Amino acid sequence: MSLSPRLYTQVSRLPRELLTACSITLATRSFSVLHRPAPNYPGHVPLTSIERGGLAVGSAVMAFFNPYRADLIAACGEATATPYFIYRLRDAMLSSPTGRRILRDRPRISSKTLSMPRLRALPPNTVGRCYAEWLDREGVSPDTRDSVKYIDDEECAYVMQRYRECHDFYHAITGLPIVREGEVALKAFEFANTLLPMTGLSMFAVMSLKPAERRRFFTIYAPWAFANGLKAEEVINVYWEEQLERSVEELREELGIEKPLDLRDIRRMEKERKKAQKAT
């Protein structure tokens, strides 16, 4: 079926990950872009149920084969969070005085809202210093998080955005690196704590790990992730901007999070052991 010039123009403006993930849907039914409801907030892309399902399946499959495509992971997270899970997370924030303040204030986390030089100058062992050092060590920036597009409720869209922008703080206080093994461990913790389906689906990436990494995940990091994720306070309710000068150990204790074994040290010692074996 050929597209009229007007319809082609409308379709071409849709986000790339939606067009890619929903290619089967587009091939089997008339695309309803001309009748799409008005967006509920800037950047919002309303989806039908079929489009949402196509986006969820397509982005999940492609993200499994290319886990470094952050846009696909973000799209999968949004498509699978509704209708129930993102509302549960929003309600968890509404049930907390701090969560309600976050929803009222709508803070954003980026290099524009956080002064990285100031964080680097904070005393050692503070949350802000720990966060800045983790970003520097891993070579990442707080400005890399995609904006939410596919969640219809404007308040829930902010909840997803907040979760997304706080992800690096979870890395920082647990010490888990951004290597695939560390990401899988953190996603397991997030799943136990937030119940967002995308975090659970991300654990299938354990199948792509090396045998030694899989053993470490199942014997060390999965037990840590589920035990701590279930017993810890809801991490979505942490007002990180107000915790920057606190002791990171004190905050972990308050949240009920035990720091896992240092994955970078384990990987380094494993590499040295293999190197020594080859030398002999």
Swiss-Prot record:
GO terms for biological process: ubiquinone biosynthetic process. It is an enzyme of class 4 (lyase). Its EC number is 4.1.1.130. Zn(2+) binds at H167, D168, H171, E183. It comes from the Eukaryota. Its cofactor is Zn(2+). Residues 1-31 form a transit peptide. Pathway: Cofactor biosynthesis; ubiquinone biosynthesis. It catalyses: a 4-hydroxy-3-methoxy-5-(all-trans-polyprenyl)benzoate + H(+) = a 2-methoxy-6-(all-trans-polyprenyl)phenol + CO2. It is found in: Mitochondrion inner membrane. Keywords: Lyase, Membrane, Metal-binding, Mitochondrion, Mitochondrion inner membrane, Transit peptide, Ubiquinone biosynthesis, Zinc. It is a peripheral membrane protein. InterPro entries: Coq4 (IPR007715), Coq4_euk (IPR027540). The keyword Transit peptide applies. It holds the Pfam family Coq4. GO terms for cellular component: extrinsic component of mitochondrial inner membrane. Belongs to the COQ4 family. HAMAP family: Coq4. Component of a multi-subunit COQ enzyme complex, composed of at least coq3, coq4, coq5, coq6, coq7 and coq9. Lyase that catalyzes the C1-decarboxylation of 4-hydroxy-3-methoxy-5-(all-trans-polyprenyl)benzoic acid into 2-methoxy-6-(all-trans-polyprenyl)phenol during ubiquinone biosynthesis. This is Ubiquinone biosynthesis protein coq4, mitochondrial. It comes from Botryotinia fuckeliana (strain B05.10). The gene is coq4.
